[in-house]
Amino acid sequence: MKHIRNFSIIAHIDHGKSTLSDRLIQVCGGLSDREMAAQVLDSMDLERERGITIKAQSVTLNYTANDGETYQLNFIDTPGHVDFSYEVSRSLAACEGALLVVDAGQGVEAQTLANCYTALEMDLEVVPILNKIDLPAADPDRVAEEIEDIVGIEAMEATRCSAKTGLGVDAVLETIVKCIPAPEGNPEGPTQALIIDSWFDNYLGVVSLVRVKHGSLKKNDKIKVMSTGQAWNVDRIGIFTPKQVDTDGLNTGEVGWVVCGIKDILGAPVGDTLTHAKGGCEERLPGFQKVKPQVYAGLFPISSDDYENFRDALGKLSLNDASLFYEPESSSALGFGFRCGFLGMLHMEIIQERLEREYDLDLITTAPTVVYEVVLNNGDLLYVDSPAKLPAVNDLDEIREPIARCNILVPAEYLGNVISLCIEKRGTQVDMIYHGNQVALTYDIPMSEVVLDFFDRLKSTSRGYASLDYNFQRYELSNMVRVDVLINAERVDALAIITHHDNAQGRGRLLVEKMKEFIPRQMFDIAIQAAIGGHIIARSTVKQLRKNVIAKCYGGDISRKKKLLKKQKDGKKRMKQIGNVELPQEAFLAILHVGKD
């Protein structure tokens, strides 16, 4: 056991986590040179295309250190994006230490801080590593000072390396062996294993990634899942060397995968404990706090025949992604679908893209909303995650919106731009600290503003230098209203949005103008209106197509022309009563972009 090291790699987006993990695998000979591909651990196509890590991946390597001993290194590569921070906390629960990778050119950024504090709260040993020292812009001494100043951990002695060229990677491995403590646990005691992650394999059923805390797991053991109490037989067990390799068992402190032939998706929830069916442990391991979705949107299959497939696909995806929440929803405009909860806009895009790619579905998304706390006149408290569920204006006493605490790190020269952006987003300043050239800003900004396009705007206003980390703080009383869209005086439930009263007029007008571009012209006028309750705040009309009925009269009596025009008018009127308007997919997407440009 004293030769096992469990660690994860944490860093801000693009500071070189995945490249460093590639190098570690190569140096330890986990894969032959021929199998080596850039970003080995980013196994989803989507991860490679966007160049980001979405799912945490684990690898077991054997490393012979300078002292002649062979160590088993289990490491877990984690995502850096703010939407996936729950993946990071899950990975950290399985480790004794973490490598904090910092780009020697860019220095400390918001995500570095957030992940580092998560690790320190879990009592992990945090080892700073300065990466990208081969860049001309690298200034390791300044960055080391920055780490000490902002993060507050010893960094002058930090290992320096360049994951791209492979310089200093051996030193990193030595540091891991020296600085990260060996796992503690009782090899003889009753078995306890923590499920870090699970996914669904069409042949094997549920595959779980586990970390054995006490005891051991062997092939053909009878084990039980503690939350459900069901017993299973261990069919296959093994490790990743990135490839799945079968072994006879896992001992205390090791990380590996287990297949028990569980076919039910809810059979082995993430964060649960596995133990032996007979003589197992009594207590469950402390799991992870459940993450609450911050953004909700309706997802509907374009053809209603896909509904069953869509439901199965969501089930399989939610096994792999513990933070995805979904419940059935029906809409008069779009038919049957699901109301899904996500951690942020990137998460929502990724899930939608994974559903469309991996399960071959065509989906329509409604506008994303956050969760509002609503107090009714009779004192009841409701949580509303969809504009359609918001009660009528006369029943409402107050609406409270969620406020996010945003920590922003920005170079001093872009401070003005960032502050004016925060004010435009109805933010209030909490704190501002100068660290050399960097400024740490803390703002309270309504979640609905953060979720929409705050991240993109922040990046563009600071030329990509500002970085953001946010978490839910509290609910606060606010003047929110629901803006409904009426098409020919009929409410379309899927187009409603909840917005602040001050922005309602502008958002309503933008929405109506946007809709006008996308709805095709019909044989009659289509009135598009935005309304708050019964009060219309904006309107535009899609003009009818009409035939020139008086073209065939030349000269002649005016009454003849009047008769033809009246006949046309009556026909159009009749048509308008029975005609209905088909809304194209683009019209629903139009709402997503309101207020972006």
Swiss-Prot record:
InterPro entries: EF-4 (IPR006297), EFG_III/V (IPR035647), EFG_V-like (IPR000640), EFTu-like_2 (IPR004161), G_TR_CS (IPR031157), LepA_C_sf (IPR038363), LepA_CTD (IPR013842), LepA_IV (IPR035654). The keyword Nucleotide-binding applies. Keywords: Cell inner membrane, Cell membrane, GTP-binding, Hydrolase, Membrane, Nucleotide-binding, Protein biosynthesis. Pfam families: EFG_C, GTP_EFTU, GTP_EFTU_D2, LepA_C. GO terms for molecular function: GTP binding; GTPase activity; guanosine tetraphosphate binding; ribosome binding; translation elongation factor activity. It is an enzyme of class 3 (hydrolase). Its EC number is 3.6.5.n1. GTP binds at residues 14-19, 131-134. One of its GO terms (biological process) is positive regulation of translation. It is found in: Cell inner membrane. It catalyses: GTP + H2O = GDP + phosphate + H(+). Residues 2-184 form the tr-type G domain. It is a peripheral membrane protein. It comes from the Bacteria. Belongs to the TRAFAC class translation factor GTPase superfamily. Classic translation factor GTPase family. LepA subfamily. Required for accurate and efficient protein synthesis under certain stress conditions. May act as a fidelity factor of the translation reaction, by catalyzing a one-codon backward translocation of tRNAs on improperly translocated ribosomes. Back-translocation proceeds from a post-translocation (POST) complex to a pre-translocation (PRE) complex, thus giving elongation factor G a second chance to translocate the tRNAs correctly. Binds to ribosomes in a GTP-dependent manner. This is Elongation factor 4. The gene is lepA.
